[in-house]
Design a protein with these regions (language model features):
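Conserved beta-strand positions
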Residues: 46, 69, 156-157, 206-207, ...
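Active-site cleft segment of glycoside hydrolase catalytic domains centered on the general acid/base Glu
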Residues: 107-256, 277-288, 312-313
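Non-catalytic accessory regions flanking glycosidase/transglycosidase catalytic cores in CAZymes
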Residues: 17-153, 186-206, 264, 319-494, ...
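Catalytic-core region of carbohydrate-active enzymes that cleave or remodel glycosidic bonds
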Residues: 239-334
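Extracytoplasmic
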Residues: 450-813
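Flexible loop residues that form catalytic
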Residues: 49, 72, 159, 212, ...
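Sec-dependent signal peptide recognition
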Residues: 2-10
Length: 813
């Protein structure tokens, strides 16, 4: 025993001595071209809820390659209907629809089927013929008449290896054993042939297993090869902690199985990828991008939480979060040449500890773009064989980063860490990246030397502090979250439910000045019913000075958001404390970042004439350009001079313009008219109400009645940008872990023309947000009417407009 203990101590000492000597490093070979970069990893399962939720601008910027969406009029979820959002899928190679989504509850008629099994009355073949195939017929006939049918993939069974429909029932449990497998195979053949009899060219995807398991895949492929029912698209899911390290093994094994049974290589779509704790965290998701680019697989992010934010890739309907920036930079690399990347890393199986990257060479061979993650210390990037590109010996290096700031924390721009000019020696360049955060991704660019580039070596970079490392007070405790968090094990602080419960944390700033303290928090529903969702009132104490802050409801504790406090702090050590006041909440981490006034806003060049501008708030911005003429902003048409002001909505604005331009914050305005709820004429069921926080709003407009009308006088004909301040907290359906939020819509009518405008759920009747839409108005008076058309209804339920507090009518420029 003594020898064993001594041996273990020696191992521990050796293990602990490794990190000190280890230098994380990544090598990019600019001469080793692997193929063309795609956006096949940019796919989503129920990521789009309704038309413009999320917005076309924020989705178009990502160049989505595939989606999995609900079958038309399906009952599985109240949103995600493929017909409602198909206009935002122009970039998609594949549009997958789950036919079983016609049924409500998870897993599709689970309780009904299990009750019949207990009674001994369930016959899977009878259920298939009498309940499922009539629905399949109805849906296929409808879908085959749609303009997107050539890209459509019918997923006829989803995760049927759970054995609910076809499994063998033994002693109260269902089993996907040999009997279950044969039942599924027969059902597959019946359904496959049935669809082909109606639509011979239909693409059918399957088997749709919940994971990749060699035996299950082999059996399925053997059966389909021998029975003339091989799917056109191979589908499985990757939802486990081993998905990333085993991704290539699964791919290679599947290709081996195809060859074994003489099947031509099929396109592969992993229609659900990512664990709950990974989705939304860019540091984790980059590993999936790398895996899919190497294997050529399409993938759709799993739906673990909400259906209205691209599976945690947007902060709301139109604002980026940190994960959006990862997928946007990935989209910018589409069409470029992928470069070989080799990593010197310590940990193969823990993604956050695995330094890795994705690199491309621009189409004109003069810029190397890299996205890297996996280190909480500075690391080296060795770019080799630049002499094989069109870069010369003088280059500009730019290093940016986005930190994970909560699932719904808005991140308006990456943080610029360094920018400098460098010399390439013998075709090689070494770059040191000041990595400090495992939950960040780093964007590194090597481009031709820019003589006008501002030299930046930021030493006062953002730093993260984990609340679980603070001093817990009262009954506060740490715990592991099922969702994305920062830090290591037990990365959340909860239990702050009564007076005295809280946490105290020390933090340090290197230099005196203004700082943003970004608090990543979660706020669940204390009441247990949707209408009980409310703010948490929290006592926050910074260096002994107390104030009460309000943390908005995030539906679930671990659906984290961001609350930002700006403080003037002297250099040195500081303390921040949080204590319960009213309502429960949880804390993840705090990112301390030097404040920089956002004078110029980011403008991303997408093509010759298309740009994406990221505005921090709704309002007017100064446009500076060497060009003047016609402009389109999110489809609203107008014209501008080379020095002008334009109205932008908060978040992403898709702009078409004939020249390059810059945008700056400005206080000036063009035409802008605000209409308050109390100034609007109501009729029918519509009501004017005031909530406990003093907000006056219009409510109870539905497809069963209620109308709001107001007049606005505008100076000229044209497209106007209408920004509405609203709240929406509706919910429908039931699911074990997804919150089935409903996106309310209002029908806006002017000049005899109507449009249905969807508004994203704000997760509380007391949380008001803005959304902006376009309205064509005529010079002079315009009567605008707000109703609800009833054009979109879930399960024939009454459809409502959102709570409306105010609207502003804004000229484009």
């Amino acid at each position: 025993m003594t020898k064993i203990i001594g041996f273990l101590i020696t191992l521990i000492i050796l293990f602990e001595s490794v990190p000190a000597a280890f230098q994380p490093a990544l090598t990019v070979d600019a001469s080793d071209i692997l193929g063309e970069s795609t956006t096949r990893a940019t796919g989503f399962l129920y990521g789009l809820a309704e038309k413009e939720v999320p917005s076309s601008a924020i989705t178009n910027a990502l160049k989505i390659s595939s989606v999995s969406q609900k079958v038309p009029d399906g009952l599985q979820h109240p949103t995600g209907d493929i017909d409602h959002i198909q206009g935002q899928l122009e970039s998609c190679d594949y549009i997958v629809t789950y036919l079983q989504d016609s049924f409500d509850t998870w897993y599709y008629c689970h309780k009904e089927i299990m009750d019949m099994r207990v009674e001994g009355t369930y016959d899977w073949k009878e259920f298939l013929y009498e309940r499922y195939l009539p629905i399949v017929e109805e849906k296929v006939k409808h879908l085959e008449a749609q303009p997107y049918k050539d890209r459509l993939v019918y997923c006829i069974f989803n995760e049927c290896d759970n054995a609910i429909w076809f499994g063998n029932y033994i002693d109260g449990n269902v089993h996907y054993d040999e009997t279950g497998r044969q039942n599924f195979y027969e059902a597959w053949k019946i359904t496959y042939d049935f669809i082909k009899s109606m639509a011979p060219d239909a693409k059918i995807g399957g088997p749709g297993f919940c994971d990749y398991e060699t035996g299950k895949i082999t059996g399925f492929m053997q059966y389909t090869a021998e029975n003339n029912c091989v799917p056109e698209i191979m589908i499985w899911h990757e939802l486990a902690y081993w998905s990333i390290p085993d991704w290539h093994l699964h791919y290679e094994d599947y290709r081996r199985i195809e060859k074994e049974y003489g099947i031509a290589e099929l396109p592969i779509i992993v229609t659900e990828y990512g664990e709950p704790e990974e989705c939304g965290n860019p540091a984790a998701m980059l590993h999936y991008i790398i895996a899919m680019e190497k294997t050529g697989i399409w993938g759709n992010m799993a739906y673990w939480r909400l259906s209205n934010n691209l599976n945690d890739t947007t902060a709301d309907d139109n604002s980026p979060n940190s994960n959006w920036w990862l997928y946007r930079r990935y989209a910018e690399m589409k069409g470029q040449q992928r470069l070989a990347v080799n990593s010197k890393t310590q940990n193969k199986y823990e993604p956050k500890d695995r330094l890795d990257g994705f690199a491309t060479l621009s189409e004109n061979s003069d810029t190397v773009n890299m996205i890297i993650t996996g280190s909480d210390k500075s690391f080296n990037v060795k770019v080799r064989n630049l002499s094989d590109t069109l870069l010369n010996d003088n280059v500009t290096v730019k290093i940016e980063t986005v930190y994970y700031e909560g699932l719904t924390g808005i991140v308006s721009a990456p943080t610029l860490l360094r920018q400098y000019n460098a010399k390439v020696a013998s075709g090689n360049l070494n770059i040191t990246v000041p990595g400090t955060d495992k939950d960040a991704v780093y964007f590194v660019t090597v481009s031709p030397k820019d003589e006008n580039a501002q030299i930046i070596r930021n030493t006062n970079i953002p730093k993260r502090y984990e609340f679980e490392n603070g001093r817990l007070k009262g009954d506060a405790y740490t715990y592991d979250s099922w969702y994305a968090t920062t830090g290591e094990l037990k990365g959340m602080v909860g239990g702050m439910e009564k007076d005295g419960d809280g946490v105290k944390l020390n933090f340090t700033v290197k230099k005196g000045g203004l700082y943003n303290l970004h608090i990543i928090f979660g706020k669940h529903n204390d009441s247990g019913v949707p209408h009980g969702r409310d703010y948490a009132k929290v006592r926050m104490i910074i260096d002994g000075k107390e104030e009460i802050i309000s943390l908005e409801n995030t539906v679930k504790s671990e659906c984290t958001s961001k609350f930002t406090v700006m403080k003037s702090l002297p250099a040195g050590i500081h303390t921040i404390e949080f204590y319960n006041c009213e309502g429960t909440y949880v804390l993840d981490s705090m990112l301390v970042s030097p404040y920089e006034a956002p004078i110029e806003i980011p403008v991303l060049n997408d093509s010759d004439n298309r740009y994406y501008a990221i505005a921090p708030h709704d309002g007017y911005y100064s446009l500076l350009s060497n060009h003047s003429g016609e402009i389109s902003i999110d489809g609203a048409l107008g014209s501008v001079e080379n020095l002008d002001i334009v109205y932008l909505r908060r978040g992403v604005n898709e702009i078409t313009f004939g020249g390059e331009f810059r945008l700056f914050a400005v206080t000036a305005k063009a035409f802008s008219k605000t209409i308050k709820a109390e100034d609007i004429t109501l009729s029918g069921k519509a009501q004017l109400l005031t909530d406990k926080y003093g907000v006056t709003y219009i409510d109870n407009i539905s497809d069963l009645g209620g109308k709001a009308e107001f007049n606005v006088n505008v100076p000229s004909d044209g497209d106007y940008r209408v920004t509405v301040l609203y709240a929406n907290n509706s919910e429908g359906g039931y699911h074990d872990y997804n919150v089935d939020l409903i996106e309310r819509y209002m029908t806006v009518t002017v000049g005899g023309k109507s449009q249905d405008v969807f508004t994203r759920n704000t997760c509380s009747n007391f949380t008001y947000k803005t959304m902006t839409f376009n309205l064509s108005l005529s010079e002079g008076d315009n009567l605008i009417t707000l109703t609800n058309s009833g054009n979109y209804k879930f399960h024939n339920r009454e459809a409502f407009a959102p709570q409306i507090a105010e609207l502003t009518i804004n000229s484009l420029s």
